[in-house]
Structures are given as structure tokens and as C-alpha cells.
């Protein structure tokens, strides 16, 4: 999974926290433990005028089209020592600035696609429908709307739309960046955070509160120091952990687990994935030669002291190709190629 992040640089590739891994690893004396990871693409170069070549410009915008979602960190704190580029604190203005740059970039993509499709439609009349949709979509964006709110009229339009990979079609998470003292009540008393929450509600996006300054401090600590730091701050989890959980919810992701002497590992899949496709995350041979999956829930495995104990109780199931893998399933795939 890859997320573009605006306003919180140097995050990079981060492990997905999952306490279940350590328990399974200890139970099976695994040589190594491998968490799932999320890659955050730093899009700090996204500034007013980027679509016209300012900042890192258009090449930069094209580079972030492959992200699955966008995380927009918006400033919700006052500090005279940290000057805002626009001279005042207004998170809704900042959101609009970024959205406009993404819209302008998407319009440019559509203009190129229209020119290409008009030519192709001369030879293939079926493509006239795409040209019509492209013009409707372009007009929609020119009115200041986001592509994700555009109404698609049929399956053909859905297929065409998915090919364009428009930035404004991607889901968004808003991270309200607050001062340290606003963390205690999760930003409830911060007027700017309230504005962001109200705005996000209108577009069915999620908002969480973060203090970037504290995140920078946490990033320099080892795991034990981090736990102590969070306890001292009376926080249950770091902002980065909040972000990871929000990302999983937004994209409908879950993790299944594999565990043995060699390694214990978490694998990220989309909710609703069937067993053969989940197996394919490990290796394409697993999907191609899938026979069955031996499955036990994490809870049943731990409660019965391990795989053998769970099997004796009849809690290890043999599942076929139609089985939908669940979050926390501990799976052993049987395959033959």
C-alpha cells in the first residue's frame, strides 16, 4: 500500500503495528518477525502553482498518481515562530489550495486524453461515449469539484474512469496538526480542528489529530523509550499509528497471518479477498496451484496454546477456493504446481 502525504515529510516506509505478531512469533519460536508495511510518499513539493510548474511542478504531480490515497496534514495551531506561507492559519483555505492544484493537474490529464480519444473515435464509434464522458468530467472539474464526486452513468464509464488515475478521485484522510496541549482532548476545544471535521464530514472523509512536533520526537526513540514517552504524555498511541489505522479503514484493508519456525508474518489484503488470491500475496505459485487453506482464528490459536491444541479442539478448518479470508486468520496454504 502506498499513500501520498502532504505536510509531514520524511515518514517513508513504516511497519504496521500488530501485537498479534509478537505473540505468534514467541509461541512458534520464529527466527524472524515481519510486519506489514505502508509506504508514505512525501509530497511536500505540492504548493500553490504546482500545476503551472512552480515548486516541483507537473513531473512531481505525475509521480504521485500511483498512490492509493492522499493524507493531507493541515495546520491547526498558532505559533508566531513558525510563519505560515499565506500569513495566517486557515486549514480550509489550505485544503482548497491543495485541491485546486490537484484539479488543475487532472484537467490537464483529461485534455490530453480527450485529444487522443477524439482521434480514436473516428475509427471506433464506441469511443464516442468516452469522449462525451471526458467532456462532462472536464466541465465538472472546471467548476471546482473533485473527480471522486463525479456521477458515472454505466459500466463503460466506470472502466474508462478507472484508467485515468485522477488525483482527485483518490480517497483523502485529513490529519489536523495541533499544538501539544490540544492532544489531551483530541482537538475538541480547537476551533480550527472543528472546521476541518465539519468539512471532512461533508465529503465523507476521516479526520484524526496529530502533533507533528511530537511525532518528530517519537521518531528518534526506540520502542521502549517510545512507550514511556507516550505514557508520560498520557497518549494511547502515536499519531503515526492513528494514521496507519485510519488508512486501513479508508482502503478496506485487513491482515492475515502466517507463522512457523522460519518466520511470523502479516500480509495485507483487501477485505473480501478469497483464499487463492490471498495466497498469491505470498507467491504467484500459491495462487496458481491452490488446493486448500488450513485456517484458524488468532484468538482460537492463542487460547488453545498453539496450532496443535486448536486442531485437537476441531478449531482448524480446511477451506476451499471460495473462502473469504478474515482479519486475524492464521493460515497455512496447501498448493501444488
Task: Put a short name on every predicted segment.
Residues 326-331:
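Structural motif
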Residues 75, 335-336:
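Short, surface-exposed secondary-structure boundary micro-motifs
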